[in-house]
Amino acid sequence: MVDTKALRAEQLQRASEISLQDDIASESVRFIAGADVGFEQQGEVTRAAIAVLRYPSLELVEYQVARVATSLPYIPGLLSFREYPALLAAWAQIQQRPQLVFVDGQGIAHPRRLGVASHFGLLVDVPTIGVAKSRLCGNFEPLGDDNGALQPLVDADEQLGWVWRSKSRCNPLFISPGHRVSVGSALEWVQHCIAGYRLPEPTRWADAIASNRPQFQRWVRKSPDLLGKHRDMI
């Protein structure tokens, strides 16, 4: 039996430790990573992929994939506890340490202000940004259809992040700071990493690696110096 009350209390405690102050200078950023988590075998296995890109060229230089036994069932609002063990396993293999990590999921745009981007950022003490494909909490004004349409994502008087249409005729992204990044800078960093697709390059590559998409296979074939491996911990 999962003690959900204790996990929610832990979320509130950890959320109080989140910093929304910018802790990185743009000139010091050499590598930005993207992280994506998925599940296999009817949820029995958790798979995390981390892609490391050189900044500002956004060239993929390293990837790591880890598969671990899933330790927690799916419980709404507690997803980060289910995902972070695989993220930590993939992170432990990274050789080119990034100065910033984009996580496919929520940052502080979470009912208890601790989405997976915030939780992971705290655990590894690295600046993080949540880049989600859907809204978990918060409200926003109607969004225009054009590329670049933008609205604040708010809960009462608190701004949690942004709703941004990164590509016309595509659903918007829900961007929120994870840890050691401000609300304003979270948006700016994501905008700096867009290269013609809906997703920013760090999480687009992480998704491609996790799913072993053709674009990733082609990159591996033409990039003999690319660092990367898959690791099973099951």
UniProtKB/Swiss-Prot annotation:
Its EC number is 3.1.21.7. It catalyses: Endonucleolytic cleavage at apurinic or apyrimidinic sites to products with a 5'-phosphate. The record marks Y74 as: Interaction with target DNA. Its cofactor is Mg(2+). GO terms for molecular function: deoxyribonuclease V activity; magnesium ion binding; RNA endonuclease activity, producing 5'-phosphomonoesters; single-stranded RNA binding. It comes from the Bacteria. It is found in: Cytoplasm. One of its GO terms (biological process) is DNA repair. InterPro entries: Endonuclease-V. Mg(2+) binds at D36, D104. Keywords: Cytoplasm, DNA damage, DNA repair, Endonuclease, Hydrolase, Magnesium, Metal-binding, Nuclease. It holds the Pfam family Endonuclease_5. Belongs to the endonuclease V family. DNA repair enzyme involved in the repair of deaminated bases. Selectively cleaves double-stranded DNA at the second phosphodiester bond 3' to a deoxyinosine leaving behind the intact lesion on the nicked DNA. This is Endonuclease V. It comes from Yersinia enterocolitica serotype O:8 / biotype 1B (strain NCTC 13174 / 8081).
